[in-house]
Design a protein with these regions (language model features):
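Bacterial Sec-exported substrate-binding components of ABC uptake systems
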Residues: 22-104, 215-241
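N-terminal export leaders
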Residues: 5-9
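Extracytoplasmic substrate-binding proteins
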Residues: 95, 152, 156-251
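Conserved small/polar residues in nucleotide/adenosyl-binding loops
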Residues: 269-276
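A short, structured surface patch at a secondary-structure boundary
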Residues: 58-64, 68-155, 161-167
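Short, structured coil segments at secondary-structure junctions
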Residues: 112, 181-182, 267
């Protein structure tokens, strides 16, 4: 007998799928089970922090929402006495439902495409050939956009994490439903970083999540080094105006503090948009 989506959802025991919420102020966890070691060094990123604890535990805190995620090594002991707002992510973090498209390129640089099971974008919507191929080969499945995920498909595959961007905040009921089903939701904020290197530094967050910190630091260091020759050049004295056209043929200009404006500023040109 076929059942409807609503009937399917009602069959899932809510008690087994309950997930603690997020919302406390960003502080290193103060429990008897966790011993604080040090703050993970970030040179540019302002939208997340990482606190390291003895035993390989790492607490990730996302700015604004103050959502906290404790990354626990695969064979590490359970942690007792955690604050109620902390979401535990035990490694390996796999079968990810990836909605935030900007994250995919970072995962590719970490050789972590196999950690993604579901995409919020169809194959034809990707500009990354490796992702298109993975979807065409059935290694990554389309599971619906951010506002309409295929809950049955995601649950059946044992999804361990949904990575969303702030668009999900327009449909909070979807985030709540995913969390109700026991799927942690990480709302990444890399797009709120004003510095290009700060955006790139988010690769360290995914390195921590996936147990690839060293690789993430190597990738970031290489990109930072590649930018240095540009930063050491003298200003060109040239001016630049940047705009784009929407699908409605309207011209839009970025703010002077915008990420794109900052990229142009890094190249030492003067922005016409600076005064807007």
């Amino acid at each position: 007998m076929k059942i409807t989506r609503n009937q399917f959802l009602k069959l899932i025991p809510a008690a087994a799928l309950t997930l603690t919420g997020c919302g406390s102020k960003a502080q290193p966890a103060n429990t008897e089970s966790l011993v604080f070691s040090h703050h993970y060094k970030l040179d540019y990123a302002q939208q997340f922090t990482a606190d390291c604890y003895e035993g390989g535990y790492t607490m990730l805190t996302i700015a604004e929402s103050d959502a906290r995620f404790l990354v626990v090594p695969e064979d590490a002991a359970e942690v007792d006495g955690l604050p109620a707002d902390v979401t535990v992510l035990r490694q390996p973090v796999e079968n990810i439902y990836l909605v935030s498209t900007s994250v995919m390129d970072l995962l590719l640089h970490l050789d972590a495409l196999d950690s993604v099971a579901f995409s919020g974008t169809k194959a034809e919507g990707w500009y990354l050939p490796a992702v298109q191929q993975a979807m065409e080969e059935g290694k990554i499945a389309y599971a619906g956009k951010y506002s309409a995920p295929d809950y049955e498909q995601i649950l059946a595959a044992g999804c361990r994490l949904a990575i969303e961007n702030t668009m999900i905040l327009h449909t909070p009921e979807v985030k709540e439903q995913l969390e109700h089903f026991g799927i942690p939701v990480l709302v990444e904020r890399s797009s709120y970083e004003s510095d290009p290197l700060a955006r790139m530094e988010w690769i360290k967050l995914y390195g921590i999540l996936l147990g690839r910190e060293e690789q993430a630091e190597q990738v970031f260091s290489a990109q930072e080094t590649a930018v240095q020759p540009i930063l050491s050049q003298e200003p060109t004295g040239k001016s630049c105006a940047f705009f784009s056209l929407t699908t409605n043929n309207l011209a839009t200009v970025r703010k002077g503090s915008d990420y794109v404006a900052r990229m142009i500023a890094v190249s030492y040109t003067h922005l016409r948009a600076h005064e807007t």
